[in-house]
Amino acid sequence: MGGRVEALPRSFGVLLAFGFGAAAAAPLPAQTDAHLQHSLDSLVQGFHGTVGIYAQSLKSGHRAGVNADSVFPTASMIKVPILIATFDAMERGQLDFRQELTYTDSLLYAGDDILGAARDSSRFPLNKLTLLSITTSDNTASLWLQALAGGGAAINQWLSDHGFSVTRVNSRTPGREENRAQYGWGQTTPREMADLLVRIREGKAVGPAASEEMYRHLTRSYWTGEALSQLPPWVQVASKVGAVDHSRSEVALVNAPSGDYVFSVITKDQADTTWDPPNEGWVLIRKVSALLWSHFEPRHPWHPAPGAERFKP
């Protein structure tokens, strides 16, 4: 089964039709990195599912992508806009970073979450919820934050007001039941998800001080086995992973020696629904991350040490 790649807009460069083994060229815009575009196109061929990728150097503006503006499930990447909306509520005085909150069993989202193991009536500061949501991808903490930030409708209003036309919270959001049935908790595009991290990096999501702390949160990921595994551990990276049965995803902004770059990789309709490291979606994310490091940092070659996979969660 060949990789299914949806058509890109003409402004993005290449129309691919892997199902028929053919590709029709379209004019490349000035900022498209033709070499990187070719490398990404080659990398996704044969993938058993649909792939979306967006990559951009923040220094040069050069970019490339595959299905960069197509709609994909966010899975746990939706926790990035939830984080932004939570900090926006803090900025407006509706929440406080240090305020104490009481956990009740009714908040539990069944799974392996740290917060879900807490006793009823336990107390937590808001900043521990944001930490758990981003660092360990705790679902119970994230759904609690979604409610504290005003719910999915309020988060979606922030996204709409700030120019994000596709990225939306679907779960527990009235009127978005059909979207939830198709995409799950949230939906986005590779380009929009990358842009969310860029807004935070540039201090333009909420205010500069809030953006700084959000960025610190995003650089503390527990999940180092995919995109992060292909990057030197001494290089700072802000990232968020996501996964559901038929989709794997990760967005990362790399503070590389030669200049920042951002990328987002999302799959959908994956044939491989296994949860082990060889999952085809995880493998693709690792390959994209390694390719981008080599492309943007040719003077700083790096590869994981033999056996590094033994020390990944």
Which ranges hold each PLM region?
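Active-site SXXK
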Residues: 61, 73-101, 133, 263
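Bacterial N-terminal signal peptides
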Residues: 11-23
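Mid-domain, small-residue-enriched loop/turn segments at the edges of structured enzyme/sensor domains
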Residues: 130, 143-202
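Structured C-terminal helix/loop/strand segments within mature extracytoplasmic catalytic/sensor domains
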Residues: 28-43, 148, 152, 195-225, ...
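Conserved catalytic neighborhood of penicillin-recognizing serine enzymes
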Residues: 108-144, 152, 183
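Acidic helix-start/capping segments at beta-turn-to-alpha-helix junctions
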Residues: 58-59, 97-114, 149-150, 176, ...
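Beta-lactamase-like hydrolase cores
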Residues: 26-73, 291
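Short, well-structured active-site flanking segments
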Residues: 88-107, 152, 207-210
